[in-house]
């Protein structure tokens, strides 16, 4: 696993904040993935999200502030460049 740190919530003063990485696995057929750290969704949000996409036990719903769009776009760009 080659984990590339992209950035944290720009309005934070330090640790314990939403963050974005790209996992760039090595090996044939391995595809990169976005790795996101965010706030856990509350029960009401989980219930609403389940209406559109039921969540298995192996997944989590998190919240990430919209001010992190730049970091998420950068992570997406890294993934796209790796697939050229």
Q: Can you say where each PLM-predicted feature lies in the sequence?
A:
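Helix-rich interaction surfaces within compact, conserved domain-sized segments
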Residues: 38, 47-84
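A short, structured beta-strand/loop element
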Residues: 14-59
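Short Gly/Pro-enriched turn/cap motifs at secondary-structure boundaries
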Residues: 8-12
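Short Pro/Gly-enriched beta-strand edge/turn motifs at strand-loop
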Residues: 1-7
């Amino acid at each position: 696993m080659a984990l590339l740190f992209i950035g944290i919530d720009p309005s934070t003063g330090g640790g314990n904040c939403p963050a974005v990485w790209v996992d760039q696995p090595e090996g044939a057929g391995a595809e990169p993935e976005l790795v996101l750290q965010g706030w856990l969704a509350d029960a009401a949000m989980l219930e609403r999200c389940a209406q559109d996409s039921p969540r298995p036990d192996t997944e989590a719903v998190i919240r990430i502030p919209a001010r992190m769009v730049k970091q998420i776009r950068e992570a997406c760009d890294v993934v796209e460049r790796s697939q050229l």
